[in-house]
Amino acid sequence: MAACAGGPGSWSENILKYFLRNNQITAEDGAEILWSHAANHKSQMNEALKSAAHMIEADVLLPSDGSEHGQPIMAHPPETSSDNTLQEWLAEVVKSNKGIKLDFKSLAAVRASMLFLDNMKQHLQRPVWINADILPGPNGSSKVVDAKAFLDTVTSFFPDVTFSLGWTTGWHPEKVNEGYSWSMVKEMDYICSELTQPVTFPVRAALVRQSCPQLLWLLTKSNRYSLTVWTGKDDIYSTEDLLYIRDYFNKTQVFYDISEPQNHEFKQAIGIRGHSLRI
């Protein structure tokens, strides 16, 4: 299927083209993009906004206790409260030139969040990524966000958004950890082949090296597809693993939302200076 990345300022604009156009990166290389992770509470959000990050990632949920009058809030489970609502978060982030990635752990907050985003759309002339884990993945839980309901709800508001669609995963230091299987990538492609938007697949750094053939197959299925390599807090993986991944895939198709010290070591090894950041 042909690429459907949007034009300048659209929510589906390729983030490399967006940040190149704004002179914030120097090459079409996914490793140049800096991430600020879990910018949920006001202090975290403010730190992210002041940072050199290009993309701000935050987590959205609906309070189960009925607080905030049913408004979506910015928090990552197991947290269920926050000093920041999505409405307040958007009002601050819109003043910046940063791209946005919103992560949903359940369907509950999706529709209400799309309504707030819709109200801000004319002020958000930048890439917007909407993320959910829609399939069970390696060592992961079967508790996923319903793919059809999620995609239908988001697309009904924003046919031009960029989707970030992942698998639930686990990683255990004492066990053999399975990678992304052929059935996992084929099921993901089956779902995404019906879409016209760009899709990035968040993949867990510690599981990627052993899954490179499967993930490369997935990327070859559409030029709308990319990978976003992320890491769990206690995962064990090496800079060599990241360099292997970088050599295996096209540099324009892989982003790295990874933690320290590997992030700094990786950027140093590939000659990208001043890019030690993952809040």
Curated annotation (Swiss-Prot):
Q: What happens when the gene is disrupted?
A: Mice show a degenerative retinal phenotype at week 15, characterized by patchy pigmentation of the retina. They have no photoreceptor function from eye opening. During development of the eye the correct number of cells are produced and the layers of the retina differentiate normally. However, after eye opening at P14, eyes exhibit signs of retinal stress and rapidly lose photoreceptor cells.
Residue ranges spanning the membrane: these are: none
Q: Which GO terms describe its biological process?
A: photoreceptor cell development
For this chain, the family text in UniProt reads: Belongs to the menorin family.
Q: What does this protein do?
A: Essential for survival of retinal photoreceptor cells.
- Protein name per the record: Protein FAM151B
Which gene does this sequence derive from?
A: Fam151b
